[in-house]
């Protein structure tokens, strides 16, 4: 058709969304209002260790206490993490670019500000890594893919800019599975630090691997369908996938304009809360972001005040490590939770809505496909982006729109479920909740629930109501503090 030929001639940047903007709001839903409140756990005195590398696995909250008290400088922390990145990064294949000059300059500025009484908050002087789909104007942004390995985007992503304003120090741009699928990128396969014969999963492969290995204080990942949950499960990290529209994606690679979300990958739930506090909020550069929605977090929220549901059929059908998933419910009971059995909507064909993602991804990278530069992609198997992009050009527009209409029904039914409970605990890969909640835009916290017989971590997920990250994080924190699985770390050689 002449129409197609003419539109193909228009130069459309990857980030430009269609005129049809997605918002996950069910009918009659009122956005939360009021002031934000952030009440973290009471701080405990932290002593500088004799060997600074003993802080490699410390949570952000402990690092922040040391930096604020000026017992440790940001430059010292930054040099320590840069050294670990150089030492272990090649083995784990988790680094695309070390941003050492930028990092040392940011760290020196953080220390100078502290010396003059300027403290930007709990991320002041804390080193972190960013998934390399986030633009940073002084370095390449490769999207993990060979066709883009020399790409330079001369702007900072909003999240990068917000973290700089919070005083954080960018030490590395970390790997992602090429164009945000899996753990294979143009330079290799990112490894799981608990078992380096295995991949880290993805697509936030580097953020999870590097955080688990103590190479950064925290990291920023992204999720479209499992890309924070899956590598966090594999690597034993704690991740927050925020509500769709809570965190700006401006300056981030677009894969699915209606499903992409950015969030932190950390060592603790409270670290996720600290990072989320810094990066969330409205951004005119991303029209899907919401205005004036508060973030209310209270680390000491009584569990009895929260209606906690558990995804009964998914827990009942667990085959592997069932003793670990059952222990999650036991711990929650012991903390005073009155667990209510619930089920996610089962009458709609959730598993058959994946072509929403495939169609949007194919459109986002249509120029790559039509230019034949997709031949440069490392993975050319059936279930990898080059071939999925090619096949998805044959998805009829009518079917894409009809799938999104079914998605609207799914949003309404899930809203009904969250009228009965505030938080739902579920096996991370149980039933269809992972795809379902990515389609509906609900927030999720994934965290370790124990270790398999092979000594590798596995996880559980807590899902919250729309824009209710504060309560979700508080509940997940109560479980994490009681279970303590996050305190174990891999032994690197």
Task: Enumerate the predicted regions with their spans.
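Short glycine/serine-rich loop segments
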Residues: 155-279, 427, 438, 442-461
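A short helix-breaking turn/cap at a secondary-structure junction
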Residues: 44-46, 238-326, 371, 375, ...
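Short helix-loop capping/hinge segments that flank enzyme active sites or metal/cofactor-binding pockets
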Residues: 32-52, 57, 123-146, 302-311, ...
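Gly/Ser-rich, acidic/histidine-flanked active-site/gating loops
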Residues: 43, 48, 53-61, 89, ...
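Gly/Ser-rich catalytic/binding loops embedded in alpha/beta enzyme cores
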Residues: 1-225, 243, 330
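Serine-dependent amide/ester hydrolase catalytic core
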Residues: 1, 60-66, 105, 112, ...
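Short, well-ordered beta-strand elements within core beta-sheets of diverse protein domains
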Residues: 62-69, 148-151, 260-267, 390-395, ...
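Short, well-ordered beta-strand elements
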Residues: 264, 456-468, 472-476, 480, ...
């Amino acid at each position: 058709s002449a129409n197609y030929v003419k539109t193909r001639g228009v130069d459309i940047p990857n980030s430009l969304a269609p005129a049809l903007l997605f918002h996950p709001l069910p009918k009659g839903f009122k956005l939360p209002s009021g002031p934000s409140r952030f009440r973290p756990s009471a701080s405990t005195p932290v002593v500088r260790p004799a060997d600074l590398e003993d802080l490699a696995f410390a949570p952000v909250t402990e690092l922040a206490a040391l930096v604020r008290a000026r017992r440790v400088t940001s430059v010292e922390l930054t040099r320590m993490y840069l050294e670990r990145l150089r030492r272990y990064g090649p083995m784990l294949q988790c680094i695309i670019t070390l941003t050492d000059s930028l990092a040392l300059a940011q760290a020196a500025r953080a220390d100078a500000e502290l010396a003059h009484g300027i403290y930007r908050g709990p991320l002041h002087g804390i080193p972190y890594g960013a998934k390399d789909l986030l633009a940073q104007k002084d370095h390449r942004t490769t999207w993990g893919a060979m066709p883009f390995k020399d790409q330079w985007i001369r702007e900072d992503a909003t999240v990068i800019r917000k973290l700089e304003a919070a005083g954080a120090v960018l030490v590395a741009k970390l790997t992602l599975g090429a164009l945000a699928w899996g753990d294979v990128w143009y330079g290799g396969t990112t490894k799981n630090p608990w078992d380096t014969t295995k991949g880290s999963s993805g697509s936030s492969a580097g953020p999870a691997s590097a955080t688990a290995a103590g190479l950064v204080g925290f990291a920023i990942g992204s999720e479209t369908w499992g890309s924070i949950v899956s590598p966090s499960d594999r690597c034993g990290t704690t991740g927050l996938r925020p509500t769709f529209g809570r965190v700006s994606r401006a300056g981030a690679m677009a894969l699915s304009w209606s499903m992409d979300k950015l969030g932190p990958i950390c060592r603790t739930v409270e670290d996720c809360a600290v990072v989320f506090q810094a990066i969330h909020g409205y951004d005119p550069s991303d029209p899907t972001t919401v205005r004036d929605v508060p973030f209310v977090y209270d680390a000491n929220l009584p569990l009895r005040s929260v209606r906690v549901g558990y995804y009964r059929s998914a827990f009942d059908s667990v085959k592997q490590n069932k003793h670990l998933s059952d222990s999650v419910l036991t711990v929650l009971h012991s903390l005073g939770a009155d667990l209510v059995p619930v089920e996610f909507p089962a009458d709609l064909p959730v598993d058959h809505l994946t072509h929403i993602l495939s169609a949007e991804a194919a459109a986002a990278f249509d120029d790559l496909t039509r230019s034949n530069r997709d031949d440069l992609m490392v993975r050319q198997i059936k279930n990898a982006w080059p071939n999925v992009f090619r096949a998805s050009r044959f998805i009829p527009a009518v079917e894409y729109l009809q799938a999104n209409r079914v998605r609207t029904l799914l949003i309404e039914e899930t809203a009904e479920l969250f009228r009965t409970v505030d938080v739902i605990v579920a096996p991370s890969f149980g039933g269809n909740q992972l795809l379902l909640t990515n389609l509906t835009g609900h927030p999720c916290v994934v965290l370790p629930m124990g270790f398999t017989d092979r000594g590798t971590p596995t996880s559980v997920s807590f899902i919250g109501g729309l824009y209710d990250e504060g309560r979700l994080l508080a509940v997940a924190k109560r479980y994490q503090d009681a279970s303590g699985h996050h305190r174990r770390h891999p032994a690197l050689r």
